[in-house]
């Protein structure tokens, strides 16, 4: 029986864990969706995190089961793909396909549809997102983008500095000990010099009482930025901290929707946005947030969710190549986390230079391989309008805290 859609719940054990104040992760938790229409397939991904958008793998799976996909397939069959792509770019995915739901549901469906359209049209990922073409008389942009490196709580500063360079931008995940964090900042600053930005990501772990002394201590140690220092949506307190801290503030968990972006600007709560494809509702909506940041003089980072497993990786990288003025770009660590991946070809980072080059197309440039099969959980047959469980042997799932 042919499948119009096949959903995978990928909870793949990680070779190396990743720890920060909001979560400790030892396995991926992504939903990967394959849509097939008239013999062409596209794959999409989301990576829901309850502490970011309030969504979980279970809630997005349930929302997908409730979402009627008839209009999605009707438009894919009935509208010329180039015209449909232009409508989606102009009006937004949710509007064109009449989909309601959380940001990760929208991301899952949008990335799958964009990948399918890219394959039909022979377009690469950056072209799908409307990336600007070459400007007459301008020098071509460099082929590679530098990426940041993250010092999380599972590795010492000494090992990080010895093994993770060269460094273009360093993010340090905060601990529950501000003195330890300041020591890490001092060690990184001494190693990289003054030309490399250093940011501490507090992941909402500071309080209004501790935020200012913590910020001053990190500033004096050599930090340039602090990311999401206070509980999500602490707009007034963020504005007050920004005025006195002597550090620039980047928002992440507080910045999920266009409404969040507008509030952040009105409250003068930040200097930079952390843009992530899954939490922001897909690459096209993420691009709109980048436009909002530019209009208001706010910097932006292209970030990742920890342990992305497939098309979400290349969607974020495509966004970065469309918006080269990003403060920094995160590449993720799929090469370190997963000896075997569910997609081919696997995403690549040049670890000798810590740079990225664009992924080859069409679409997001990858397909599901045999390693994906055990993670399949639901199928939507062409002959049926309802999802059916997939009966496959399940891999051992390791808890991710």
Stretch-by-stretch model annotation:
Residues 33, 39, 109, 122, ...:
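Conserved, mostly hydrophobic/aromatic
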Residues 1-54, 335-342, 390-401:
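Structured beta-strand/loop patches that form or line metal/cofactor-binding pockets in enzymes
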Residues 28-30, 111, 119, 182:
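Conserved N-terminal beta1-alpha1 strand-loop-helix module at the mouth
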Residues 2, 35-37, 41-120, 396-401:
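Metal- or metallocofactor-binding catalytic centers and their adjacent structured scaffolds
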Residues 234-240, 244-248, 256-355, 359-363:
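Shared catalytic-loop signature of beta/alpha-barrel
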Residues 123-245:
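Metal-dependent enolase-superfamily TIM-barrel catalytic cores that perform enediolate-based chemistry
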Residues 335-401:
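C-terminal extensions of enzymes
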């Amino acid at each position: 029986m042919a499948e119009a859609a096949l959903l995978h719940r990928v909870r793949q054990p990680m070779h190396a864990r990743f720890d920060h104040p909001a979560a400790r992760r030892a396995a991926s938790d992504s939903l990967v969706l394959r849509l097939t229409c008239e013999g062409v397939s596209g794959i999409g991904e989301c990576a829901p995190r309850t502490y970011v958008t309030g969504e979980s793998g279970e809630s997005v799976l349930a929302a997908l089961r409730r979402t009627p996909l008839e209009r999605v397939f009707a438009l894919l069959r009935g509208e010329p793909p180039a015209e449909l792509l232009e409508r989606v770019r102009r009006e937004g995915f949710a509007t064109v396909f009449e989909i309601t739901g959380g940001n990760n549901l929208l991301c899952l469906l949008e990335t799958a549809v964009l990948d399918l359209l890219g394959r039909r049209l022979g377009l690469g990922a950056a072209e799908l997102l409307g990336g600007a073409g070459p400007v007459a008389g301008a020098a071509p942009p460099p082929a590679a983008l530098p990426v940041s490196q993250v010092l999380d709580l599972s590795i010492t500063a000494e090992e990080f500095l010895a093994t993770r360079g060269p460094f273009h931008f360093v993010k340090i995940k905060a601990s529950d000990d501000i003195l330890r964090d300041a020591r890490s900042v001092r060690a990184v600053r001494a190693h990289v010099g003054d030309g490399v930005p250093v940011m501490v990501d507090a992941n909402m772990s500071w309080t209004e009482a501790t935020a200012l002394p913590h910020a001053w201590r990190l500033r004096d140690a050599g930090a340039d930025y602090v990311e999401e220092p206070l509980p999500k949506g602490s707009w007034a307190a963020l504005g007050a901290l920004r005025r006195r801290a002597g550090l620039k503030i980047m928002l992440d968990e507080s910045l999920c929707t266009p409404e969040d972006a507008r509030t952040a600007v009105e409250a003068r709560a930040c200097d930079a946005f952390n843009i992530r494809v899954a939490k922001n509702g897909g690459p096209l909506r993420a691009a709109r947030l980048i436009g909002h940041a530019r209009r208001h003089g706010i910097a932006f980072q292209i970030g990742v969710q920890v342990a992305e497993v497939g098309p979400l990786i290349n969607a974020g990288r495509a966004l970065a190549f469309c918006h080269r003025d990003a403060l920094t770009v995160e590449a993720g660590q799929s090469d370190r986390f997963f000896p075997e991946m569910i997609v081919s070809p696997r995403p690549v980072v040049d670890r000798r230079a810590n740079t990225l080059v664009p992924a080859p197309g069409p679409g997001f440039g990858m397909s599901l391989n045999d390693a994906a099969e055990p993670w399949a959980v639901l199928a939507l047959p062409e002959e049926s309008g309802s999802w059916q469980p997939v009966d496959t042997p399940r891999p051992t799932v390791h808890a991710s805290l």
